[in-house]
Amino acid sequence: MLQWRRRHCCFAKMTWSPKRSLLRTPLTGVLSLVFLFAMFLFFNHHDWLPGRPGFKENPVTYTFRGFRSTKSETNHSSLRTIWKEVAPQTLRPHTASNSSNTELSPQGVTGLQNTLSANGSIYNEKGTGHPNSYHFKYIINEPEKCQEKSPFLILLIAAEPGQIEARRAIRQTWGNETLAPGIQIIRVFLLGISIKLNGYLQHAIQEESRQYHDIIQQEYLDTYYNLTIKTLMGMNWVATYCPHTPYVMKTDSDMFVNTEYLIHKLLKPDLPPRHNYFTGYLMRGYAPNRNKDSKWYMPPDLYPSERYPVFCSGTGYVFSGDLAEKIFKVSLGIRRLHLEDVYVGICLAKLRVDPVPPPNEFVFNHWRVSYSSCKYSHLITSHQFQPSELIKYWNHLQQNKHNACANAAKEKAGRYRHRKLH
């Protein structure tokens, strides 16, 4: 027992006596206590110390206590909040930085808390300031994209750095900028930094950017928990470089989008552009998921309310161009949440803008719709497509789009006869 105490308890044998005591005089004792108390206060009031990670690293600029009612159809009537507004910040484009300097090492970063901590390390190592403000530097930017043409529609496509095949498939299909004759479309892929920080991958992305000029990338970690940052990057880019664009769609890289139906049946270029317009698949009355094992887990510390405001599924929503700047600016005074579509809904509630339902509730789908040319000629989004599937079904729809439902009926009858014969 004595050996264990010597190895693991004390580095040197000490005997205690009044002669050795730090408190052998009243004055020394008082000074020692004052010093210890001062050190305690110093360490207790600094959140940047190592070993103290947590939600304090997440940008927090308000205390939220609202959105408790699910009866109201409006997005703001049940808004009961205590806001702590931050000083207005102007939209300032950041100069692109050299990607060769991106030498962080967030290997294996997963989960909400680790992502927030890694974001903080990027700020510290890059010297970009405190994460309470949105100041991520551009690695790749396209500031002159809207100077060459005046787009009617901008497609903001959230993509992972390694999804090269998905980006190629989108360029060949629904993201083709020449898809609608007489209608200017701009396609922009939104990227962060790959968790693996593969130098070859970053070089390939830069080559891809030089060829297509449709990638914008900033130096935040590209994770699920940073989708809100990615979307705000797109909003800020539109507000800064394409402020007069009538409409914007934000969607994901695994989506099927019927761009022609979106333009001609929903947005209708012949009509005057709408303002404060936001639509998609409406999510009403949803409660925060408190299951810590869930992908959609929302900690009570971040969002204590019992209900989310009305929001649109992040798989695909459409909004008027004037909202890009409004959403980005109001976000600077709102606590950042990792659920991007919920967060955008909160921004809209603060702006007192109600998302409106689309003409048909099956136009926007955040699930995969079984394919038929008839169904896909009358929808805008369908989810979970591999690049090869996207090309296959897109080509089939283009071949049959003028008689989509008639051809679909013929194909169905042909399959029925084939099964009957065999």
Curated annotation (Swiss-Prot):
Region (Disordered): 91-110
All ranges on the Lumenal side of the membrane: 44-422
Keyword Lipid metabolism on entry: yes
A family per Pfam: B3GALT2_N
Enzyme class: transferase
Keyword annotations from UniProtKB, A to Z: Glycoprotein, Glycosyltransferase, Golgi apparatus, Lipid metabolism, Manganese, Membrane, Signal-anchor, Transferase, Transmembrane, Transmembrane helix
Cytoplasmic topology ranges: 1-20
Tissue expression notes: Detected in brain and heart.
GO terms (BP aspect): galactosylceramide biosynthetic process; oligosaccharide biosynthetic process; protein glycosylation
A cellular-component GO term for this protein: Golgi membrane
Subcellular location(s) per record: Golgi apparatus membrane
InterPro entries found in the cross-reference section: B3GT2_N (IPR045821), Glyco_trans_31 (IPR002659)
Pathway: Protein modification; protein glycosylation
Mutation effect (residue 86 to A): In strain: BLG2/Msf, MSM/Msf, SWN/Msf and NJL/Msf
Cofactor(s) annotated in UniProt: Mn(2+)
Domain of life: Eukaryota
Reaction(s) the record says it catalyses: an N-acetyl-beta-D-glucosaminyl derivative + UDP-alpha-D-galactose = a beta-D-galactosyl-(1->3)-N-acetyl-beta-D-glucosaminyl derivative + UDP + H(+); a beta-D-GlcNAc-(1->3)-beta-D-Gal-(1->4)-beta-D-Glc-(1<->1)-Cer(d18:1(4E)) + UDP-alpha-D-galactose = a beta-D-Gal-(1->3)-beta-D-GlcNAc-(1->3)-beta-D-Gal-(1->4)-beta-D-Glc-(1<->1')-Cer(d18:1(4E)) + UDP + H(+); a neolactoside IV(3)-beta-GlcNAc-nLc4Cer(d18:1(4E)) + UDP-alpha-D-galactose = a neolactoside IV(3)-beta-[Gal-beta-(1->3)-GlcNAc]-nLc4Cer(d18:1(4E)) + UDP + H(+)
Keyword Transmembrane attached: yes
Regions crossing the membrane: 21-43
Compositionally biased spans, kind Polar residues: 95-110
Enzyme Commission identifier(s): 2.4.1.86
Protein family per UniProt: Belongs to the glycosyltransferase 31 family.
Function: Beta-1,3-galactosyltransferase that transfers galactose from UDP-galactose to substrates with a terminal beta-N-acetylglucosamine (beta-GlcNAc) residue. Can also utilize substrates with a terminal galactose residue, albeit with lower efficiency. Involved in the biosynthesis of the carbohydrate moieties of glycolipids and glycoproteins.
PANTHER family in alphabetical order: BETA-1,3-GALACTOSYLTRANSFERASE 2, BETA-1,3-N-ACETYLGLUCOSAMINYLTRANSFERASE
Protein known as: Beta-1,3-galactosyltransferase 2
Species of provenance: Mus musculus
Highest classification ranks of the organism: Eukaryota, Metazoa, Chordata, Craniata, Vertebrata
Gene it is expressed from: B3galt2
